Amino acid sequence: MVDTHKLADDVLQLLDNRIEDNYRVCVILVGSPGSGKSTIAEELCQIINEKYHTFLSEHPNVIEVNDRLKPMVNLVDSLKTLQPNEVAEMIENQGLFKDHVEDVNFQPIKYSALTSNNEECTAVVARGGTANAIRIATVDNPVNVNKLAQDSINIAQIVPMDGFHLSRRCLDLFKDPQTAHKRRGSPSTFDSNNFLQLCKILAKTSLCKVSSHHKFYSTSSVFEKLSKTFSQTIPDIFVPGFNHALKDPTPDQYCISKFTRIVILEGLYLLYDQENWKKIYKTLADTGALLVYKIDIDYEATEERVAKRHLQSGLVTTIAEGREKFRSNDLLNGRDIDNHLIKVDNIVHIRND
């Protein structure tokens, strides 16, 4: 079993080491289907946030939000802007660029939009269209920390790769839609273009520095340091999740807010050495604030786990069908990951048998 408390300590130590140079740190957590990566990511996130909530309960009124008079950081200034007629055409095509659904070289583009909460934002879309959109807040709402419930301030946030599954409508437009649906979960059935763009955005926020009038000492805790270095200039970033009942992405399921100082990215292909996936590691590693974990587990242990998950999700009607789906798809994806793992020295391998 994985010691998630030890992982939490390692992540917080990285944040402590980098807090003068990086606004946030990132964690990559990779594993084959059924390896338990989602559960580990959720536990890790919960442990870190609970530790911080405990600190806040013992240190009331410690939070400060700096840089209130400065403009928000522009995270996508280099992206092409969609013109209104192009936005209308995309919406008419059910939020898709019909000629680019399989184009892994399609460059993400931006346009003005609204979040699911009807707030103004910049939407960033790629070959998956609006289903896999990243939305970045453009309205600077000043934070009144005195009105915030302490247990609502989370410094860690998970971002599953699942939200970047290409929608079923998108797969319908593939040259071979039958194979695309059958092999859903393979590398080509994710919007790797926009996930890489998300990593570029996160890297840019990671390298932001905060103006703080406080002087910290070696005895200052990491929670004390980060509590004094939140920044109003960091915009909220909304990313999609995945609805297993609907079998499609859902918009704005996760929010990486200005209080998020640790982003836990979990998924199958974040260390994959092909197409856009191969650029993710370097994009985040160049910030100097990255931890990378690969979960190793025997495939025999994952078959039953994944088969039951398929049954519960309604993808199959019997456990036998679930096992067959695992062998014909998930097992192939897991082996593909192992055969195409990027070659870097700082991947920490952990067992979850």
From Swiss-Prot:
Superkingdom per UniProt: Eukaryota
Presence of the UniProt keyword Nucleotide-binding in the record: yes
InterPro entries the UniProt entry points to: P-loop_NTPase
Enzyme class: transferase
GO molecular function: ATP binding; kinase activity
Protein residues bound to ATP: 31-39
The enzyme's E.C. designation: 2.7.1.-
Matches recorded under SUPFAM superfamilies: P-loop containing nucleoside triphosphate hydrolases
UniProt entry keywords in alphabetical sequence: ATP-binding, Kinase, Nucleotide-binding, Transferase
Main function: ATP-dependent kinase that could be involved in endoplasmic reticulum membrane assembly.
Family: Belongs to the YFH7 family.
Protein name: ATP-dependent kinase YFH7
Organism: Saccharomyces cerevisiae (strain YJM789) (Baker's yeast)
Gene: YFH7
